């Protein structure tokens, strides 16, 4: 598929997603799922496949009025966030939704070790097939955790493998807003972080004094097979690190279309962020973004009243973007950046907007057929310190909103992609979000927003469950 054809297919996919038009294809599979892929949800204890299927069948057979959840990949994590998601599934979801179509994978560090990371490879394959994924926060083990958990090695973050496996183009991180509750930004802020390339896929070696030569051998074209020198330098330090990485630009066209399409839908002003004055190799990122905007979106932004006639797409240096995120508290803008800059800037975005718990995180990839693969998760980690307090018997108060927004996004996307019980799924997820927002407005939320009088983790879960029944 050529880049132009790919762009057209992606544009159609984005239009379908924005308009919420569902695919007519119903998901089916005859794939046999290994027993170790499925885990128990309460307390993190593993169960075999037959036990899990018995539970699924029981969910679907006892209440015909239950919503039928569309096929979705559910990735289990660990520590405090896994505990809270266990509660949410048992108290909010499973009494009302038949989740028999979900494929659940145990991505805890111990299971990755036990399966030699086969579970991660199976998650990626399932994600390609099903196209809708929810992932709980997971642990990337430190050296101390490797010893404590009895692991054979320090397994790397699964995120990079997922981004590559699903042909990731962007990680979307947006502000979450609750009417009547003051957070950071008054209006929505959208952020697109290039999902691949940069330091995250780097190779490195610790070295001493010597000569460093970086070479490249083209695999096609007139110079195929001929090695060329990219860089050559003397290292004079006794201790140094040599790092190599590359930035792929083929999928920046897809990133641009997705970013500008979302900004247009939300009616917010787009900005492109680089450090191209210093890092000259970042220039193509800006040029591609500007070309796609000028040729495909500029007139639409003017027609929608988001930009004025003659107004150009604005480039921001990453230094300036850092300041603008603090200054533009009114919100109403979008930014797109390289992988590393996007990582740093979205951390700042989260702090301005109260905490990472009020930021969404959505990996968007493109299937080989041109349709979108979407993986949803919280933008924060496993909250290990709070889990340690819970295990000591202390009260905790974890705000689950970021994780719930991820679950809502995954369930809605699954229903849209597979066209299964779509209307009831959207109605249920909307009610779930509405109830959470109501409780926060009434001062009955978790303590990060409601102070010492706020509810504990378990009290908040129960409060939402009661209103879902109302």
Curated annotation (Swiss-Prot):
Performs an essential role in the oxidative function of the tricarboxylic acid cycle and respiration. Catalyzes the decarboxylation of isocitrate to produce 2-oxoglutarate and generate NADH to provide electrons for energy production. The keyword Transit peptide applies. Its cofactor is Mg(2+); Mn(2+). Mg(2+) binds at residues 319, 343, 347. D-threo-isocitrate binds at residues 157-163, 193, 200, 275, 319, 343. It comes from Ostreococcus tauri. It is an enzyme of class 1 (oxidoreductase). This is Isocitrate dehydrogenase (NAD(+)), mitochondrial. One of its GO terms (molecular function) is magnesium ion binding. InterPro entries: Isocitrate_DH_NADP (IPR004790), IsoPropMal-DH-like_dom (IPR024084). Binds 1 Mg(2+) or Mn(2+) ion per subunit. Keywords: Magnesium, Manganese, Metal-binding, Mitochondrion, NAD, Oxidoreductase, Transit peptide, Tricarboxylic acid cycle. Forms homodimers. NAD(+) binds at residues 138-140, 159, 324, 380-385, 399. It comes from the Eukaryota.
């Amino acid at each position: 598929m050529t880049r132009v054809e790919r762009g057209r297919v992606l544009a159609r996919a984005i239009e379908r997603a924005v308009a919420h038009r569902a695919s007519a294809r119903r998901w089916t599979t005859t794939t046999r799922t290994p027993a170790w892929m499925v885990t128990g949800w309460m307390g993190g204890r593993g169960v075999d496949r037959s036990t899990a299927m018995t539970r699924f069948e029981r969910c679907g057979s006892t209440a015909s009025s239950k919503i039928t959840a569309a096929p979705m990949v559910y990735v289990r994590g660990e520590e405090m966030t896994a505990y809270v998601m266990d509660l949410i599934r048992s108290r909010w979801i499973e009494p009302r939704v038949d989740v028999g179509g979900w494929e659940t994978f145990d991505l805890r560090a111990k299971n990755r070790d036990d399966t030699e990371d086969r579970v991660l490879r199976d998650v990626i394959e399932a994600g390609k097939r099903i196209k809708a994924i929810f992932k709980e926060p997971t642990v990337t083990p430190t050296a101390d955790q490797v010893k404590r958990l009895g692991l054979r090695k320090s397994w790397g973050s699964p995120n990079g493998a997922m981004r590559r496996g699903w042909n990731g183009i962007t990680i979307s991180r947006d502000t979450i807003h609750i009417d009547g509750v003051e957070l950071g930004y008054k209006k929505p802020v959208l952020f697109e972080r290039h999902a691949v390339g940069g330091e995250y896929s780097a190779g490195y070696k610790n070295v001493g004094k010597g000569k460093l030569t970086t070479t490249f051998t083209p695999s096609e074209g007139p110079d195929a097979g001929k090695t060329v020198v990219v860089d050559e330098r003397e290292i004079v330090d006794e201790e140094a690190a040599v790092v190599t990485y590359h930035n792929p630009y083929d999928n920046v066209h897809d990133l641009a279309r997705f970013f500008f399409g979302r900004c247009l839908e939300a009616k917010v002003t787009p900005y492109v962020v680089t450090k191209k004055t210093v890092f000259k190799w970042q220039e193509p990122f800006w040029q591609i973004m500007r070309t796609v905007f000028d040729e495909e979106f500029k007139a639409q932004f003017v027609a929608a009243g988001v930009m004025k006639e003659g107004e150009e797409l604005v480039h921001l240096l990453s230094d300036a973007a850092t300041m603008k995120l603090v200054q533009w508290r009114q919100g109403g803008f979008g930014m797109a950046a390289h992988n590393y800059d996007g990582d740093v800037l979205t951390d700042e975005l989260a702090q301005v907007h109260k905490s990472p718990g009020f930021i969404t995180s959505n990996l968007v990839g493109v299937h080989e057929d041109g349709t979108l693969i979407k993986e949803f998760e919280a933008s924060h980690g496993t909250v290990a310190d709070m889990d340690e307090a819970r295990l000591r018997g202390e009260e905790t108060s974890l705000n689950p909103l970021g994780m719930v927004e991820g679950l809502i996004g995954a369930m809605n996307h699954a229903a849209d992609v597979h066209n299964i019980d779509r209307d009831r799924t959207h109605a249920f997820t909307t009610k779930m979000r509405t109830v959470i927002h109501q409780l926060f407005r009434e001062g009955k939320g978790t303590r990060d927003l409601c102070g010492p009088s706020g509810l504990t983790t378990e009290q908040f879960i129960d409060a939402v469950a009661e209103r879902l029944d109302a």
